Design a protein with these regions (language model features):
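Hydrophobic scaffolds flanking metal-cofactor catalytic centers in soluble metalloenzymes
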Residues: 1-206, 212-221, 235, 244
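Short acidic (Asp/Glu) and glycine-rich catalytic loops that position anionic groups and cofactors
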Residues: 144-147, 287-289, 315
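Secondary-structure transition/turn motif
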Residues: 136-139, 293-297
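Bulky hydrophobic/aromatic "packing anchor" residues in well-ordered structure
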Residues: 50, 143, 275-276, 281-282, ...
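Long, low-complexity, charged/polar intrinsically disordered regions in eukaryotic proteins
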Residues: 238-296
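Residue-level signal for threonine
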Residues: 57-60, 277-279, 302
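C-terminal intrinsically disordered extensions
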Residues: 206-263
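Long, charge-rich, low-complexity alpha-helical segments
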Residues: 296-348
Length: 348
């Protein structure tokens, strides 16, 4: 698979150098058959991993409005509702509101697998509808690059983190460029990615300070949708040369980092089958924990995970064993990484 298949089409003419970079197909974490939904007890049964509000920058929002694709109709309506509420609505894009951030903090105060269903669903992405994304063609960086389990293990996660950083850099730089081209005062343009903390128009209780909101938007107040459309019309005509000029050395460094990490990703791809080393001895003397021993090398794991480890028998596909883990609300990524590094999981 190549990055062109993952990156939204709006970027294809802007940074074509990245499009042909190959990577192993992510077979464990797939959106259509979400691993987080395998167990009926999963708190994510109705949300998948979409317990996150993406920051849609100005030109991505404009893309949703300009595009006639029927699959974006619900997304348009939801963005229009956000604009009407004014919560999180800025010239840079629509960011998570203070109210959303507070709900997110409350959810994150619980362990990942033990979060209450109601709390998890309170932080469902506002663009999610019946398990599908209503703004998919114009999704943001994390929605392109997040995998709860990568087929490349730690190397895969490192690769996607670099791609994520690159896309976030592109979003931020292009959003600022669009504002500049539309006559926004340069001294008022923030040069970093923005968060709710950068603006003071929303109180902690969620009440919007209309005067501060009007001051933020200036002459564009009441024409937010038009502004976002204008941003998109600017960015859609940008070529690769202009993008390079805008992003400079930061882009060069990140492109090199993506190329470097891609090599390790390819080399670290999990085999289709894994086998627990025949010489591994299991010490079960502790009721709650088991000690896997291979010569002088040891690994301590929860006794409840032994059946999963034994499932690596050289006959069961690696992806299937990961699925068994999610069936009991356990992500096997770190454990598999550790056992492979210690030589306890090998190719049959």
């Amino acid at each position: 698979m190549i990055l062109q298949n993952k990156i939204p089409s709006i970027y294809h003419s802007i940074f074509p150098e990245l499009l042909d970079i190959e990577f192993p197909e992510e077979q464990i974490a797939t959106c259509d058959t979400c691993t987080l939904c395998r167990s009926p007890q999963s708190p994510y049964i109705n949300t998948k991993c979409c317990t996150y509000q993406p920051t849609l920058v100005n030109f991505l929002l404009g893309g949703v409005f300009v595009d006639d694709d029927i699959n974006l109709a619900i997304g348009k309506e939801r963005i229009q509702s956000q604009i009407k509420s004014r919560a999180g609505v800025t010239p840079y894009g629509i960011i998570p509101s203070n109210a959303y951030i507070q709900r997110e903090k409350q959810a994150n105060s619980h362990d990942f697998w033990s979060r209450p269903h109601q709390l998890v669903e309170s932080i469902r992405c506002p663009y999610s509808h019946k398990g599908l994304c209503t703004v998919w063609k114009y999704r943001e960086n994390l929605c392109v690059t997040f995998f709860c389990s990568s087929i490349g293990g730690a190397a895969g996660k490192t690769f996607w983190k670099k791609v994520n950083t690159y896309l976030k850099m592109a979003e931020t730089s292009l959003a600022q460029y669009a504002m500049l081209q539309l006559g926004w005062p340069p001294a008022k343009i923030k040069t970093d990615a923005v968060t709710a903390a950068d603006f003071k128009f929303e109180e902690e209780d969620g009440i919007i300070n209309d005067a501060k909101y009007a001051a933020l938007w200036g002459d564009w107040i009441g024409r937010e949708e038009e502004f976002y459309r204008s941003c998109f019309n600017i960015i859609k005509n940008i070529d690769a040369s202009t993008f390079k000029q805008i992003t400079g050395q930061t882009r060069e460094i990140l492109e090199a980092a993506i190329t470097d990490t891609q090599k390790y990703f390819q080399l670290s791809n999990l085999p289709d089958f894994l086998l627990l080393h025949p010489d591994v001895v299991t010490d079960k003397s502790n009721e709650n924990h088991a000690l896997l021993v291979l010569g002088e090398i040891t690994a301590e794991i929860s006794s409840a995970l032994l059946p999963l480890v034994y499932s690596f028998n050289g006959k069961r596909q690696t992806v299937e064993v990961f699925q068994l883990g999610y069936n009991v609300l356990f992500n096997m990524s770190e454990l598999v990484e550790e056992l492979r590094e210690k030589g306890m999981l090998i190719k049959p």
